[in-house]
């Protein structure tokens, strides 16, 4: 059992906490939360969620310094500088770094300077010791080497399992990805200044093209795809659940049925629970609360000229991603000596 603290109790921080509360036989103990908001507000937002609904069968209370969940006290602190946090005093082993601010190794090491032993960044990292996508390269995690780690992005977690299947089975020559992505907290509700002029526009009434490093980041977990993938994002007026549109040129000639069979076999075998496969005629809201990283929509798979393959897949960019953060934290806990 390792002692864990969450830094940043926003969408991913709270989703992670809910995932942990629902996980039986967890090897981690949630000990503390650092957030700029006060414990009572955070307790309220944990219990009542516009996407997930009310947290049922859980008793949540709060005071000035803590949140209590079913009798278990989670200490709360509020400091924007990680080096000031009481991680040494509270004997914290692992930080779930979900502020979106301290994503570089230099930034994450501030938690280590404060006494934590390891940091798991819930975003693409910079100069981190390793990036891991569960189901793709998690077996490469080395407890003695990887201290500042990244769980990549929600989109990379959706894309990488599909890329792995297609590359292993057919060989990827090159490809591109478009993610139709729900709006996030990094956009403006109404037109207002932003470093990205498109993200400056009202999120709930616009389709907002923007950049994403998700496709390039696949090479961090599947090195043979380095330089072969790129992509863009379209932020759309939905609050959650996104969709990847992945187009690749492959070495081995194939047909639609063969591509779908390869994806289905993976979903029932080595990638079970990570990659799902659906032939149902569903829409985005149907996938709210889905645990899998990626759900292939088989009816949308296309093959042109036997070598151009298009696969589309849904993902819950909050809940599904947070489940993988918890999975990676559990992996770290299992390797702890």
UniProtKB/Swiss-Prot annotation:
Predominant cellular place of this UniProt entry's protein: cytoplasm
Stored Pfam families: Gp_dh_C, Gp_dh_N
Name of the protein in its database record: Glyceraldehyde-3-phosphate dehydrogenase 2
E.C. designation(s): 1.2.1.59
Record CDD domains: GAPDH_I_C, GAPDH_I_N
Subunit structure: Homotetramer.
Coiled-coil intervals: none
Record GO biological process: glucose metabolic process; reductive pentose-phosphate cycle
Site (Activates thiol group during catalysis): 181
Binding site for D-glyceraldehyde 3-phosphate: 153-155, 184, 199, 212-213, 235
This protein's encoding gene: gap2
């Amino acid at each position: 059992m390792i002692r864990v603290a969450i830094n940043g109790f926003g969408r991913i921080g709270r989703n992670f906490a809910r995932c942990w509360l629902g996980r039986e036989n967890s090897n981690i103990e949630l000990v503390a939360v650092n957030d700029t908001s006060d414990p009572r507000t955070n307790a309220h937002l944990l219990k009542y969620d516009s996407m997930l609904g009310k947290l049922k069968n859980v008793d949540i209370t709060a005071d000035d310094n803590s949140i209590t969940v079913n009798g278990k006290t989670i200490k709360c602190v509020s400091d924007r500088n990680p080096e000031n946090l009481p991680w040494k005093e509270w004997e914290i082993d692992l930080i779930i770094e979900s502020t979106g601010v301290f994503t570089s190794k230099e930034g994450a090491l501030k938690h280590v300077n404060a006494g934590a032993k390891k940091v798991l960044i819930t975003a693409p990292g910079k100069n981190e010791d390793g990036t891991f996508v569960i189901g793709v390269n998690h077996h490469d995690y080395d407890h003695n080497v990887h201290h500042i780690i990244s769980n990549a992005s929600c989109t990379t977690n959706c894309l990488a399992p599909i890329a792995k299947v297609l590359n292993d089975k057919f060989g990827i020559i090159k490809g591109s990805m478009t993610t139709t992505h729900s709006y996030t907290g990094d956009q403006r509700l109404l037109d207002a200044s932003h470093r990205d002029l498109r993200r400056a526009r009202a999120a709930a009434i616009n389709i907002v093209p923007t950049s994403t490093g998700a496709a390039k980041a696949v090479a961090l977990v599947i090195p043979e795809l380095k330089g072969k993938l790129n992509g863009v994002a379209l932020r759309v007026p939905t609050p959650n659940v996104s969709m990847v549109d992945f187009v690749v040129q492959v070495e081995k000639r194939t047909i639609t049925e063969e591509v779908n069979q390869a994806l289905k076999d993976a979903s029932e075998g080595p990638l079970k629970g990570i990659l799902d496969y659906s032939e149902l005629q569903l829409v985005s809201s149907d996938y709210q609360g889905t645990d899998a990283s990626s759900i292939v929509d088989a009816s949308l798979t296309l093959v042109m000229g036997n070598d151009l393959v298009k696969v589309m897949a849904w993902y819950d960019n909050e809940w599904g991603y947070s489940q993988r953060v918890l999975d990676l934290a559990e992996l770290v806990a299992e390797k702890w000596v």
